[in-house]
Swiss-Prot record:
This is Prostate-associated microseminoprotein. Acts as a ligand for C-C chemokine receptor CCR2. Signals through binding and activation of CCR2 and induces a strong chemotactic response and mobilization of intracellular calcium ions. Exhibits a chemotactic activity for monocytes and lymphocytes but not neutrophils. Belongs to the beta-microseminoprotein family. Pfam families: PSP94. Residues 108-139 are annotated as: Disordered. The gene is MSMP.
Length: 139
């Protein structure tokens, strides 16, 4: 119902400019699969690749950002991709061509998926402990 009011242009009087921004940004942040960064561009035009969008309409950019038109105040976008951040040193992240999906592959042979090894407390980019591994001893 609220979106129907937005699309009909009736919400401006009820919610005001900031109310519209808050409503649409809360909807963006609740979008399934959105667990990464979001940003807002004030006064940005609501068009992408030659197509124009109206208030409340959204589109998916080639760089995996889901954007929503907040006309006349701007555009809000959130990254929909989920990038692995903690993985064995012998692996690397690859984006699957033409999609917003990522996978872990072996550095030595990117055609093969990443193999998990035994527990290694030094494992990963964040140097986080492996679940179930013994705690390091302090000296």
């Amino acid at each position: 119902m609220a979106l129907r009011m937005l699309w009909a242009g009736q919400a401006k009087g009820i919610l005001g400019g900031w109310g519209i921004i808050c409503l649409v940004m809360s909807l963006l942040l609740q979008h399934p699969g959105v667990y990464s960064k979001c940003y807002f561009q004030a006064q940005a035009p609501c068009h992408y690749e030659g197509k124009y969008f109206t208030l409340g309409e959204s589109w998916l950019r080639k760089d995996c950002f889901h954007c929503t038109c907040l006309h006349p105040v701007g555009v809000g976008c959130c990254d929909t991709s989920q990038h692995p951040i903690d993985f064995p040193a012998g692996c690397e992240v690859r984006q699957e061509a033409g999609t917003c999906q990522f996978s872990l592959v072996q550095k030595s042979d990117p055609r093969l998926p990443c193999k998990g090894g035994g527990p290694d407390p030094e494992w990963g980019s964040a140097n986080t402990p492996v679940p179930g591994a013994p705690a390091p001893h302090s000296s």
